[in-house]
């Protein structure tokens, strides 16, 4: 190959030579340029896809924000496409009616109805409560429909009249009705089923009026919380926590959003509900029977063949483990123990005000009396939080086995490395009303604050209360029993349910997205789960047609870059083909030259003298 040399008066080692720029080198340069261009285009495509994904994520976040804002706006009853539903919660102390609405289903069998609570023109929730409870109609069941009439009239006034005939009505009775004999329950429900349709045009049948169990109520509450938090939306974003779920005998696990567990401590009872994602094994038939009575497996989807909305939830209610009832149990225990010790040891502790029993669960210096069986036990607050927790340990009634279950009730294990829980009612009041620590729970900070509160003199707490240093919801009852209830909450959470002290995913709350969430939302979600089938069938019966406007923006990008790659690949193949043709021509020229040289030698050979 010919070479082009550059020489100058430099040292010999500086002399250099460059290959001649031939057609081959030009092809190599062109191929290199095309390769770089392809790399740049592919890089741009990947970057654009990531940018699109980021924008899509921000769009979803923005839509969620808009949905939260829309939830607080007045319901547009002029929208003829809206559907409505009514749920009456017949509780022990009173009954409440809730009105819900939802737009037409989007036609995707994997999505649930978008049910929201109706709001009036002032953007207030449409809800009405009456007292006393419907259980007071036990002796006069024929008046049950008259009792509930004001609630239904209230709901009917907010729902467009032409929508009444297609609006389902559910009357669900809870604790107050459960304690009645079955005959009285049936008499009340029969009167409702007979008389309500004569007064109102709602969709209402015998199956729409029932007394639900505590287990059902817990499941509905669990559904409500997770629905509002968006945990049933199976579009998983990068920041969403997921869990692998096994359903029945399926070998492959379903990967979906992690649901939250719910712990609710009221005044009289304690309830816990959480998903059990894996199929359980039991050491004995007895354990299996007990576990099945506390597990609820249900499908929230409209298609029973689809298992992505099948959930297995553990629900248990502990009667007597609420904050106020636990205090009564504690006072009973202290009273009986003190009377017994006084009788055995001949002492007079607590009998007179000048020799009170020191109670570690009351603030320092607080004077109180416990009356049982016409006897008074005088107590004086000692304010020792650790000692209080020790005295509360027997009230947990834990089993003697290795699991040490709360109240000796079986509980499936919780994966504390991949779970999340919300604490409501007393959990929120204990952390927020006085300690002002509601929200994300930290056991060390909570224990420190609780100890400091308990050790404060009662007079100091009164001064702080009068100065407005506590929540507006705090009252004298809260100040008096905060020390006890904080110790009880701590014991329930860590000694009863065995939550690790460093567990990071427990939150105490009163509202979810600034609104109160009722179990009735979960009830209507479950009751109306098959309604989307109607919209899906209507959608499938329409003639299919293609709309270019429905093609995703990202697909256009894919098509654009695919076309560019095809063109570049064609250019590369064309250049390679030219190279092969050029090589063939070069070989042919070399062969011709060789043949010509051989021919010359052949001609010259005869004339050469020997």
From Swiss-Prot:
Residues 1-28, 577-610 are cytoplasmic. The gene is entpd7. Its EC number is 3.6.1.15. Belongs to the GDA1/CD39 NTPase family. This is Ectonucleoside triphosphate diphosphohydrolase 7. The lineage of its organism: Eukaryota, Metazoa, Chordata, Craniata, Vertebrata. The active site is at 217 (proton acceptor). GO terms for cellular component: cytoplasmic vesicle membrane. InterPro entries: GDA1_CD39_NTPase. Keywords: Calcium, Cytoplasmic vesicle, Disulfide bond, Glycoprotein, Hydrolase, Magnesium, Membrane, Metal-binding, Transmembrane, Transmembrane helix. It catalyses: a ribonucleoside 5'-triphosphate + H2O = a ribonucleoside 5'-diphosphate + phosphate + H(+); UTP + H2O = UDP + phosphate + H(+); GTP + H2O = GDP + phosphate + H(+); CTP + H2O = CDP + phosphate + H(+). One of its GO terms (biological process) is GTP metabolic process. Disulfide bonds join 454-483.
């Amino acid at each position: 190959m010919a070479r082009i040399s550059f020489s100058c008066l430099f040292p010999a080692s500086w002399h250099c030579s460059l290959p001649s720029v031939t057609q081959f080198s030009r092809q190599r340069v062109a191929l290199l340029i095309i390769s770089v261009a392809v790399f740049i285009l592919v890089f741009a495509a990947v970057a654009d896809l990531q940018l699109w994904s980021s924008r899509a994520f921000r769009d979803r976040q923005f839509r969620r924000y808009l949905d939260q804002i829309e939830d607080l706006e007045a319901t547009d009853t002029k929208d003829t496409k809206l559907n409505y539903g009514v749920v009456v919660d017949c509780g022990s102390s009173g009954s409440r009616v809730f009105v819900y609405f939802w737009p037409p289903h989007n036609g995707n069998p994997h999505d649930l109805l978008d049910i929201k609570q109706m709001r009036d023109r002032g953007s207030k929730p449409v809800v009405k409560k009456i007292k006393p409870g419907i259980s007071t109609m036990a002796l006069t069941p024929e008046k049950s429909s008259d009792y509930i009439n004001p609630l239904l009239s209230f709901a009917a006034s907010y729902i467009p009249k032409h929508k009444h005939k297609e609006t389902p009505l559910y009357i669900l009775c809870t604790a107050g009705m459960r304690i009645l004999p079955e005959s009285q329950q049936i008499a009340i429900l029969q009167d409702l089923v007979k008389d309500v349709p004569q007064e109102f045009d709602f969709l209402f049948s015998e199956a729409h009026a029932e007394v639900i169990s505590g287990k059902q109520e817990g499941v509905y509450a669990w559904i409500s919380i997770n629905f509002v938090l968006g945990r049933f939306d199976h579009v998983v974003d990068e920041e969403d926590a997921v869990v692998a779920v096994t359903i029945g005998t399926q070998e492959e696990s379903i990967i979906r959003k992690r649901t939250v567990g719910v712990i609710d401590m009221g005044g009289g009872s304690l309830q816990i509900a959480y998903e059990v994602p894996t199929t359980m094994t039991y050491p004995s038939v007895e354990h299996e029977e007990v576990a099945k009575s506390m597990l609820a497996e249900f499908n929230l989807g409209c298609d029973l063949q689809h298992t992505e909305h099948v959930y297995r939830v553990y629900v248990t209610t502990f009667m007597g483990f609420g904050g106020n009832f636990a205090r009564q149990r504690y006072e009973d225990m202290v009273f009986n123990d003190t009377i017994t010790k006084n009788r055995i040891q001949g002492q007079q502790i607590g009998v007179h005000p000048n020799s009170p029993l020191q109670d570690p669960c009351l603030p320092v210096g607080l004077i109180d009396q416990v009356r049982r069986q016409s006897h008074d036990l005088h107590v004086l607050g000692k304010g020792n939080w650790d000692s209080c927790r020790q005295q509360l340990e027997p009230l947990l009634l834990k089993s003697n086995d290795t699991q040490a279950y709360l109240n000796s009730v079986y509980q499936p294990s919780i994966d504390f490395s991949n779970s999340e829980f919300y604490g409501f009612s007393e959990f929120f009041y204990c952390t927020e009303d006085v300690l002002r620590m509601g929200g994300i729970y930290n056991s060390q900070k909570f224990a420190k604050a609780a100890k400091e509160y308990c050790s404060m003199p009662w007079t100091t707490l009164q001064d702080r209360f009068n100065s407005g240093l506590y929540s507006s919801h705090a009252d004298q009852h809260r100040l008096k029993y905060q020390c006890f209830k904080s110790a009880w909450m701590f014991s329930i959470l860590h000694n009863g349910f065995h939550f690790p002290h460093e567990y990071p995913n427990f939150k105490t709350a009163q509202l979810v997205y600034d609104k109160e969430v009722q179990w009735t939302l979960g009830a209507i979600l479950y009751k109306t789960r098959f309604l989307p089938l109607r919209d899906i069938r209507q959608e499938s019966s329409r003639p299919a047609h293609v709309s270019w406007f429905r093609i995703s923006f990202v697909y256009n990008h894919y098509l654009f870059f695919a076309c560019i790659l095809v063109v570049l690949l064609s250019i590369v193949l064309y250049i390679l083909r030219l190279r092969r043709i050029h090589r063939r021509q070069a070989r042919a020229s070399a062969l011709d030259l060789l043949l010509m040289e051989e021919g010359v030698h052949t001609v010259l050979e005869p004339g050469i003298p020997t």
